């Protein structure tokens, strides 16, 4: 397989293939043939040589030069660069018809303003700047309506079939991107009618609770337990419990005493007490 066939097959092109192999033809020659050429004597090396007479095989290296009687040198450039340049021109000309837009974008100038484009009496600046179809009249760009420009831009790409350039990359590079509706929305009216709930996206909330327990044993044996709870909203609640030596704990004046979760009996009573009471 020649370089041209490999290049065309990789990019998905088909067509007439050159039977010459100018790049790899010189690599397939034997060293014996090179030695024979060095031993040959003559003024002309190229088309005047016997090697270039008659039909040449694709493996022949078709580049030579000869000396004219006036002392000049003439090159016979049959290396295949003309075919290479012609193939590249054909490839990139086909690519241009597929990728380039139909016409370059034009920006309206101050002189292209028409009476239909001017803002109507009583029409607000916001309404005049809304994109079509939210506004009542389509915009005019460069002397043509926006609907005409959209119809031209929405024309399908030429059907290349299986021989389209780079058709093997369709999974990675989609030819026609998915169209999205880009329209202006009147959020003021929507908020006044429905409120901010449907407009604003719901934000996820996190619920957590931070618990800090501090125990202080006084010299007389009294144990003071301070329990501070901070929730996700930032609310803080502090519970103080006093327990005298050899007596049950009693609550402080700040808040009622919650069940203690320090020992295993309190944990079992908390989780299983209600279930046994309901039986």
From Swiss-Prot:
Coiled coil: none annotated. Residues 203-245 are annotated as: Involved in ATP2A2 binding. GO terms for biological process: negative regulation of apoptotic process; regulation of actin filament polymerization. Residues 270-279 are annotated as: Required for ITGB6 binding. Residues 183-279 are annotated as: Required for localization in sarcoplasmic reticulum. InterPro entries: HAX-1 (IPR017248). The modification Phosphoserine is found at residue 192. Residues 184-279 are annotated as: Involved in PKD2 binding. Residues 176-247 are annotated as: Involved in GNA13 binding. Residues 30-42 have a biased composition (Acidic residues). It is a peripheral membrane protein. It is found in: Mitochondrion matrix; Endoplasmic reticulum; Nucleus membrane; Cytoplasmic vesicle. Residues 217-239 have a biased composition (Basic and acidic residues). Residues 2-42 are annotated as: Required for localization in mitochondria. The record marks 127-128 as: Cleavage. Recruits the Arp2/3 complex to the cell cortex and regulates reorganization of the cortical actin cytoskeleton via its interaction with KCNC3 and the Arp2/3 complex. Slows down the rate of inactivation of KCNC3 channels. Promotes GNA13-mediated cell migration. Involved in the clathrin-mediated endocytosis pathway. May be involved in internalization of ABC transporters such as ABCB11. May inhibit CASP9 and CASP3. Promotes cell survival. May regulate intracellular calcium pools. This is HCLS1-associated protein X-1. The gene is HAX1.
